[in-house]
């Protein structure tokens, strides 16, 4: 055995069983590549990535832990998202959530995102 080696059991391993999953079409309108990690709250990614943030609220990329998806400028691609598990609390990142990722906090998230978008427009 090699240190860190993973030897899976025979058969298939089902990941994220019972969690809600969605597909989201993402368009990158910025001028620099953007990389999003596996456990980042997808609704809070860079504003140069355009997609339905309401649909992505409380979701992360459905990819292996420690990996990422890269978005090149001008690129449009569909990604698979899965519900964030655990205590379902998000703090930090872009500061648009800072609390529970539930239906009750969705309006607050959308308002925070809009305020940050308006500030960015004013700076241009």
UniProtKB/Swiss-Prot annotation:
Q: Where found, per UniProt?
A: Cytoplasm
Q: What is its pathway?
A: Nitrogen metabolism; urea degradation; CO(2) and NH(3) from urea (urease route): step 1/1
Which keywords belong to this entry?
Answer: Cytoplasm, Hydrolase
Entry keyword annotation includes Transcription: no
> Is Cytoplasm among the key words of this record?
yes
Q: Which reaction does it catalyse?
A: urea + 2 H2O + H(+) = hydrogencarbonate + 2 NH4(+)
Which GO biological process annotations does it have? urea catabolic process
Q: What is its EC number?
A: 3.5.1.5
Q: Which Gene3D superfamilies match?
A: Urease, beta subunit
Read off the InterPro entries from this record: Urease_beta-like, Urease_betasu_sf, Urease_subunit
Pfam families of this UniProt entry?
Urease_beta
Q: What class of enzyme is it?
A: hydrolase
Record's GO cellular component terms: urease complex
Molecular function terms from GO: urease activity
Spell out the family assignment given in the record's similarity comment.
Belongs to the urease beta subunit family.
NCBIfam families recorded: PRK13203.1 (NF009682), urease_beta (TIGR00192)
Q: Self-association or partners: how does it assemble?
A: Heterotrimer of UreA (gamma), UreB (beta) and UreC (alpha) subunits. Three heterotrimers associate to form the active enzyme.
Q: What is this protein called?
A: Urease subunit beta
């Amino acid at each position: 055995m090699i240190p860190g080696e993973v030897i899976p059991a025979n058969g298939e391993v089902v990941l994220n069983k019972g969690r809600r999953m969605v597909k989201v079409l993402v368009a990158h309108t910025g001028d620099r590549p953007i990389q999003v990690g596996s456990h980042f709250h997808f609704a809070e990614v860079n504003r140069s990535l355009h997609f339905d943030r309401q649909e992505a609220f409380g979701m992360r990329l459905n990819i292996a832990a420690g990996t990422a998806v890269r978005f090149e400028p001008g690129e449009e691609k569909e990604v698979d998202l899965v519900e964030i598990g655990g205590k379902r609390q998000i703090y930090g990142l872009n500061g648009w959530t800072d609390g529970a990722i539930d239906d009750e906090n969705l309006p607050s998230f959308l308002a925070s995102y809009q305020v940050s978008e308006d500030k960015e427009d004013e700076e241009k």
